[in-house]
UniProtKB/Swiss-Prot annotation:
This is Malate dehydrogenase. The lineage of its organism: Bacteria, Pseudomonadati, Pseudomonadota, Alphaproteobacteria, Hyphomicrobiales. Substrate binds at R83, R89, N121, R152. SUPFAM superfamilies: LDH C-terminal domain-like, NAD(P)-binding Rossmann-fold domains. It is an enzyme of class 1 (oxidoreductase). Its EC number is 1.1.1.37. The active site is at H176. Catalyzes the reversible oxidation of malate to oxaloacetate. GO terms for biological process: lactate metabolic process; tricarboxylic acid cycle. Keywords: NAD, Oxidoreductase, Tricarboxylic acid cycle. PANTHER family: L-2-HYDROXYCARBOXYLATE DEHYDROGENASE (NAD(P)(+)) (PTHR43128), L-LACTATE DEHYDROGENASE (PTHR43128:SF16). The gene is mdh.
């Protein structure tokens, strides 16, 4: 049986980490693509030479021509400019929209049957634009956001409670920006809701609120520390979890930027919601009920996404 083919568009920090993780998890053969000739080829060779040590069998290649991604089962898009200190995700729109147009055309021509995961920021706008430019079905194009944001929240919670991250579940919905919505009511430690843990004295509401705020600013915290780039280990791990659920038909429930056509009262936008990812891509959207505060936060987040979409339309009239 032929191995799956994974195409990685963008061979920067996230792209290289994705390529390595795909090999370690034996998800399939990997093609690294980048417009800077030599970089994808060099990283592909470097990772391939680690395979005998780590004991995984996967073919690696690097390319600067979109024809190399032909027939890919999964395409993960990281191409674009990362955030620098002082930049918001939204500052990247003008630059990265042009990148999405080129990437969308490449996918449309060479990998129209792929499951596409977008990581490029500002995420909710870029995944929307990528779907438009590629013309792929909306259930086969998804954005990596909530898995990462939820992982950050889980890490902070596990540290606070002194428990294993495996026993912490966390839910972060909405847009992948400062208005994201970490839902404490749906987040648990070994099944016990965070709201109950406050009552039990495990933490205080103030500490919980601080962790929520730190989660919202999680990407910016790393940007400010690195000074020359943005996060790449956790974003790559998050996208690989999504790819694995698709390739192995695991049907995991993962918070992702998914296309909504009526769910949550939203039509025609990509917004972070819990979805089931299986062999057909996004197979179901899980609609959770909000209390009044959560509903207000979610609507604020959705309005931020709408603003990004309008900005995209004003920059590129093909999207209008």
């Amino acid at each position: 049986m032929a191995r799956s083919k994974i195409a990685l568009i963008g061979a920067g920090q996230i792209g290289g980490t994705l390529a390595h993780l795909a090999g370690l998890k034996e998800l399939g053969d990997v093609v690294l693509f980048d417009i800077v000739d030599g970089v994808p080829q060099g990283k592909a060779l470097d990772i391939a030479e680690s395979a005998p040590v780590d004991g995984f069998d996967a073919k690696y290649s690097g390319a600067s021509d979109y024809s190399a991604i032909a027939g890919a089962d999964v395409v993960i898009v990281t191409a674009g400019v990362p955030r620098k200190p002082g930049m918001s995700r939204d500052d990247l729109i003008g630059i990265n929209l042009k990148v999405m147009e080129a990437v969308g055309a490449g996918i449309k021509e060479h990998a129209p049957d792929a499951f596409v995961i977008c990581i490029t920021n500002p995420l909710d706008a870029m995944v929307w634009a990528l779907q438009k430019f590629s013309g792929l079905p909306t259930n086969k194009v998804v954005g990596m956001a909530g898995v990462l944001d939820s992982a950050r929240f889980r890490h902070f919670l596990a540290e606070e409670f002194g428990v294993s991250v495996e026993d912490v579940t966390a839910f972060v919905l909405g847009g992948h920006g400062d208005d994201m919505v970490p839902l404490t009511r749906y987040s648990t430690v070994a099944g016990v809701p965070l709201t109950d843990l406050v009552k039990l004295g495990w933490t205080t509401q103030e500490k919980l609120d601080a962790m929520v705020e730190r989660t919202r600013k999680g990407g910016g915290e790393i940007v400010n520390l690195l000074k020359t780039g943005s996060a790449f280990y956790a974003p790559a791990a998050s996208a690989i979890a999504m790819a694995e659920s698709y390739l192995r038909d695991k049907k995991r429930v993962l918070p992702c930027a998914a296309y909504l056509d009526g769910q949550y009262g939203i039509d025609g936008l990509y917004v972070g919601v819990p979805v089931v990812i299986g062999e057909n891509g996004v197979e179901r959207v899980l609609e959770v009920t909000f209390n009044d505060d959560e509903k207000a936060m979610f609507e604020k987040s959705v309005n931020s996404v709408k603003g990004l979409i309008e900005a995209c339309k004003s920059v590129n009239d093909k999207l209008a």
